[in-house]
């Protein structure tokens, strides 16, 4: 079996291409989920202030036998904290029981309140101080990203966006790539695979490779060069989602999955919502 792949970010730091998402997991659930994930081989954990489970993540990491330098921990600056990124980060670090973050992401641009450029400047300062190794954003459209770059000269290393076979965001993914911004997929299985796992091409590929539909979709993300963070608290599914290193999809198969794109957004529109 091939080793899990690592992505090099434009700031020179590296991160695992596949991680564990913990959205909607309780503090108790997340402890067991991370224990299982680390046992299986995950080294990247993606949480957020808004998930209200940073304390559980911190307890799980404290109890882990994996060295801190082997882990890649991400959390996110919530909308209400865009004018106080330093305080918000310090609160997150305390809950996570960490001295630094590997990746700090701004959760939404929230253009209606228009604080995201100032928040980004604050995050740049936190990176310079060494409190965070890398900084990025979530749910930013091209015009939001361009404004960050124009006004600060510092591009995000990551843009984490809703991305799955029904919502492939090819234009944004390509723009990110042109600007050396790594695209990361949230809701990569389209919220449990509804409308995806029953697609003929997904079922046929699952049969061909002896894999589950979820594994086919995760492999599609990986083979498209995306960082992917499927969420689960179910031990068997956590293991299943990581067992994707012994096969690859070919160009034609990727092309067939590309045809599933409907522009079907399951989450909020970044221009209309604050999450």
Curated annotation (Swiss-Prot):
Keywords on this record? Cytoplasm, NADP, Oxidoreductase
GO annotation terms (biological process):
L-ascorbic acid biosynthetic process
Specify the domain of life of the species encoding this protein: Bacteria
Q: Spell out the protein name for this chain.
A: Putative methylglyoxal reductase DkgA
Q: Which reaction does it catalyse?
A: hydroxyacetone + NADP(+) = methylglyoxal + NADPH + H(+)
Task: State the Pfam families in the record.
Answer: Aldo_ket_red
Record-linked PROSITE patterns: ALDOKETO_REDUCTASE_1 (PS00798), ALDOKETO_REDUCTASE_2 (PS00062), ALDOKETO_REDUCTASE_3 (PS00063)
